């Protein structure tokens, strides 16, 4: 599942955002080093926790605190990380491999098309992978930008087809799925954003995309063509950066969660 700022995800998900403040030059190097280590640990925890609700995390922290108290010691970051991982059932090998491929596809296309930064990826869940992506501010909302956005949304499915030759239902099946979001955006491009191939000056509001696409076969065809083009573009990007993509898949599969810095260490040579 793709989480990003312009299209909101489930309201009960908890996202931890850390501010990188590189201007604390008034403090000594030891303090800065300690704060950097703390920030790195928190980023790791935030990445591990993607997909959990606030109530889930509250329960994890409470149980970790009780465990530390019983052992008469202080609570550590490792306790919380262990609690997060213990909260989730073990994901089968083949499913975890598919998750890693899918999320790496999103990440490689997001980075290659310069949509913004990557805060983290995780496949340490039993309900699909999760990623935290941000988008550069101040970019014009042109048809080209929306085309890149669609390519990123279709990239998980494209990656599965490239590597596994089959696709799972993970990119669809829910209101906040990749396919659902991509369909809504492509429909907006046709009817509400002024990019349509027919009557582009009309603003046609639609509260039920399923209903309107089911009734209008021609509109459904135009929307589907946009999605096909986006998937083809994502496929091309992944092939062009196949070496970096393969490295990211392996690293994500092994670690099960990577923060943004770890992802960029892998993708940076392709910038």
Describe the residue ranges of each PLM region.
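Soluble catalytic regions of large protease machineries
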Residues: 18, 94-101, 107-271
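AAA+ ATPase "lid" subdomain C-terminal helix
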Residues: 43-75, 88-91, 107-119, 190-196, ...
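A general structural motif at alpha-helix termini
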Residues: 46, 61, 84, 249, ...
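Alpha-helix N-cap and coil->helix boundary residues
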Residues: 37-41, 59, 75, 79, ...
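A general structural signal marking secondary-structure boundaries and capping sites
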Residues: 4, 8, 68-71, 157, ...
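Non-catalytic accessory segments flanking P-loop/AAA+ NTPase cores
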Residues: 1-33, 59-62, 69, 75
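Hydrophobic aliphatic residues
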Residues: 4-8, 84, 88, 154, ...
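Short conserved motifs of the RecA-like P-loop NTPase core
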Residues: 13-21, 25-51, 78-91
